[in-house]
Amino acid sequence: MKNARLFLIAIGVFYIINLIGTLPFSTLGLFGRMYPGVELHVGAPIFTLLQDAWAVVGLQLGAIGAVALWGARDPGRYRAVIPVVIATEVVDGLWDFYSIVWSHEALWFGLVTLVIHVLWIGWGLHAWRALASKSLRTL
C-alpha cells in the first residue's frame, strides 16, 4: 500500500508540473529546445494551434494527476488510476518515439523523455502488482 501511495503522489505531482509546463506561457522556450532548427512560426495561427494542442495534453495529464493525488489517500480503492497512468506513459512513449524519428524532436530530449516513461511504467507495474498481491492475501 505504501508503494502505491508514493507512486500516486509522485505521478500526481509530476503530472501537475507537466500541466504547468504545457501552458502557453511556458511552451515557447520548451519548443525551441525540443525542436531545434525547426521554424516554429511564433505568432502565426499554426503556432497558436500547436500551443493549444499542448495545453490540452497538459490538461489531460493534470486531470490524471489530480485524481492520482486524491487517490493516494486510499490507494486500494483508487487502484484503477495506476493502469491509466501506465497506458498514458506507453502512449506518450510511442509519441516521443514518433517525434524523434519523424517530427525532428531533439534526440537528447526524446531519449530523456523515453527514459522517464520507462521509469514511470516500471514503478506503476510494481505498485499495481503489490496492490494485487495484497488483495489476494486478504481474500
Swiss-Prot record:
InterPro entries attached to this UniProt entry: BphX
Record-linked Pfam families: BphX
Domain of life per record: Bacteria
Protein name: Uncharacterized BphX-like protein Bxeno_C1129
Organism of derivation: Paraburkholderia xenovorans (strain LB400)
Lineage: Bacteria, Pseudomonadati, Pseudomonadota, Betaproteobacteria, Burkholderiales
